[in-house]
Curated annotation (Swiss-Prot):
GO terms for cellular component: cytoplasm; extracellular exosome; lysosomal lumen; lysosome; membrane. It is a peripheral membrane protein. This is N-acylethanolamine-hydrolyzing acid amidase. Glycans are attached at N37, N107, N309, N333. The keyword NAD does not apply. It catalyses: an N-(long-chain fatty acyl)ethanolamine + H2O = a long-chain fatty acid + ethanolamine; N-hexadecanoylethanolamine + H2O = ethanolamine + hexadecanoate; N-dodecanoylethanolamine + H2O = dodecanoate + ethanolamine; N-tetradecanoylethanolamine + H2O = tetradecanoate + ethanolamine. Gene3D superfamilies: Penicillin V Acylase, Chain A (3.60.60.10). Keywords: Autocatalytic cleavage, Disulfide bond, Fatty acid metabolism, Glycoprotein, Hydrolase, Lipid degradation, Lipid metabolism, Lysosome, Membrane, Signal, Zymogen. Pfam families: CBAH (PF02275), NAAA-beta (PF15508). The gene is NAAA.
Amino acid sequence: MRTADREARPGLPSLLLLLLAGAGLSAASPPAAPRFNVSLDSVPELRWLPVLRHYDLDLVRAAMAQVIGDRVPKWVHVLIGKVVLELERFLPQPFTGEIRGMCDFMNLSLADCLLVNLAYESSVFCTSIVAQDSRGHIYHGRNLDYPFGNVLRKLTVDVQFLKNGQIAFTGTTFIGYVGLWTGQSPHKFTVSGDERDKGWWWENAIAALFRRHIPVSWLIRATLSESENFEAAVGKLAKTPLIADVYYIVGGTSPREGVVITRNRDGPADIWPLDPLNGAWFRVETNYDHWKPAPKEDDRRTSAIKALNATGQANLSLEALFQILSVVPVYNNFTIYTTVMSAGSPDKYMTRIRNPSRK
């Protein structure tokens, strides 16, 4: 998908072309996210430093301050500042080591670096699609929507995590953030996460951290690192205790290997697999339980379904999926990036920065 762009391509069904035209999309190709290697063979405190050296640390610090100031309640900031050293003992490695290493490098407090990593967990509005084409190939795409696009678009990166010099898994993240909302284990599975807002987020999250529950994006990364196949990944993502509710979308490499997992903090609320033999060749997840109507003021779901049906199963590809994720309002003013991926073709993992000129 390195050549994917927002220009309509020959072969796309005419209805999808009309949807794209109605969205007023530019023909300019959105820029690809920068790609870096992070060696998991390095100690956690040092492994991100080669990446940080490519960035203006004042920009990174300003972005973190903006996110904390807007997304973290003052009582949480005060509380974490008092208990951060105790809380650190409850959090899993390598994440805490990586956070500590980056905040030392940037001369920031451990409390602030931990808070910004938690803040990114709390407000991620997204659209994820997993689908199977008529030949049995599995495709997975996602839009990540978030405020602060003026700075976060400059800090979005694709990271290849290396073990013994080989790519163990790939993910998309923001500089300073150790979790992954989007990722791929080559020739095994792909994962994306969408927020499931159930209220009282900070109160529940902090209490769960002290019970050794894991942040939702950290579990995606741990699953990419540890799970050997699609089935194992689904089991880990469905059952591991979390600090917040979430939707996990998983794609595999074989026919029917696609699922949306609706999570409560303590376990699965629903498992919604592909069922292509009965016509369900795709699943669309935004930020709402799939068995309930999407709210009229945020119905990205219906637009995505219409675009998928306009494309058709026989015409599905990573490029077509990118175009589907470019239909308004699936693609909107808050969209930071679009990633398309297929675990069976891991070299085609591609993230493109959306709205690059928007302030």
